[in-house]
């Protein structure tokens, strides 16, 4: 089946990854308004949670304005067609949190691990399947391992019961060849019935291009967000990806103009820091740093009189991964002690 004949599954992440862009401070009214617009525009799923997934609200990652369940319930009140999705990182969220999210209305879960740690997802994937959820394996920081090793990890998630596996460019560090190689490796390793997905970040301005290449390589699901609302320079902007898909003649099933209106009229005004490629977010992609480190690094830079870029580049040199936000202050203090 070619790209024009098959339907692309459009997975919106404005209300989960987009949390990072405003330090997890969406109001319930904001969440409801955005979800209603997305639902009316025809997206397939709407992911809802703290930026770091279920139970992510904490000192380490940042406290949310509301609980995950309050946000999910607010979305459940307004959506009529789209499925509600959520994110779970083993070690942060538990199966008890997943059951509560399911009871609140979530029917899709993406179980996320570092790209070489799929083995820690087994319990959560198996439990999600027992609930009857659409269960996705989400391999974060996929640039940090080879395509062949990524395929090995993907097969583990598949063996636990995941019916879709994502290549996740958490650092926005990959180019089109990197994406192509990883999807080819996954397609060769996985059962043909297992779907694949792409989660791109825009730190090198390649979020849309990488998503297009993924679809060309047989990718079934595409993550994107209104106005690119997400960590770092954001995700692939949903309205831009859909416009490009429309020009390519692809079947996406969404209303482009409704998405454009929602991006500019609803989402962009909420940004307290522009979601864009700039000096700091470009450093994320260039150094291969976890995108949600951005706001934490800027806080540390202000506190200690440093440049955020220097902190981010050093984090990349040390190959820090998601979950190591506490190391940002350590890096800042090291830079203070040992200035270049």
Swiss-Prot record:
Metal-binding recorded as keyword: yes
Protein's name in the database: 4-hydroxy-2-oxovalerate aldolase 1
Site (Transition state stabilizer): 16
Assigned protein family: Belongs to the 4-hydroxy-2-oxovalerate aldolase family.
Residues reported to bind Mn(2+): 17, 199, 201
Binding site for substrate: 16-17, 170, 199, 290
HAMAP family per record: HOA (MF_01656)
Ribonucleoprotein listed as a keyword: no
GO terms, molecular function: 2-isopropylmalate synthase activity; 4-hydroxy-2-oxovalerate aldolase activity; manganese ion binding
GO biological process: catabolic process; L-leucine biosynthetic process
Domain Pyruvate carboxyltransferase, first and last residues per copy: 8-260
EC number of the protein: 4.1.3.39
Catalysed reaction equations from the record: (S)-4-hydroxy-2-oxopentanoate = acetaldehyde + pyruvate
PROSITE patterns xref list: PYR_CT
Key words, A-Z: Aromatic hydrocarbons catabolism, Lyase, Manganese, Metal-binding
